[in-house]
Amino acid sequence: MGQGQSVILSFEDGARTVELARESVEAFVQNGQREQPGSMRDAFYNRTSAFVRLESTRGRGRLRGCAGAHGSIHELGNHDQQLGHAIVEAAIEAASEASCGSEVEDAELPNIRVSVCTVSNLVLTDDPIEDIELGVHGVAIDGDGQHGWMYPTLPVENDWSVFEYLDRTCRKANLPDGAWQDEDVMVTLFEGQVFRETGDEDDPVEELTA
């Protein structure tokens, strides 16, 4: 198991990642424009990866869109993009038709909850069952030209075992259950901070922890 460079955000910086993702989604959906990060906080110049999830707040809270900053999990460790720009790109992709089959519409925006996961450590593993710590490690799976990922907080929120966590990530990548055991499938673990909108005007963003 090997680790990459650590990037840790303050709560204020984390809250701003969510604001930037929200602004990027709205600019894309309403005007077809790419949000410019502008004068970024110092932490946003770090070269690291980010993921964005868009969930509907209606009904059972179905996933409306999700995307990472890179087109392939193989590129997770290639820190060639600043965090601010990575968030903008991921937010736009999450809101696009390519993410969950249909582009987010303007009327949906008030009922969309935005969350951001910033990658703080990259963990390369040959034995995910042994190495995964639930609530700490996100999972990214890449194989057969497909890729998928899940936040580190999801297995704790949903009471998944390590095996279920890996299988569900395989399904996210359109791979069969158990594909994570195949030699030609790459499993990468990542540690990250997850920040999410709350819908509360007084405390609009929370940091999720296990």
UniProtKB/Swiss-Prot annotation:
UniProt cross-references to InterPro entries, sorted A to Z: AMMECR1 (IPR023473), AMMECR1_dom_sf (IPR036071), AMMECR1_domain (IPR002733), AMMECR1_N (IPR027485)
Question: A Pfam family in this protein?
Answer: AMMECR1
**Entry protein name:** Protein VNG_2543C
Q: Which domain of life is it from?
A: Archaea
According to the entry, every stretch annotated as the AMMECR1 domain falls at: 12-206
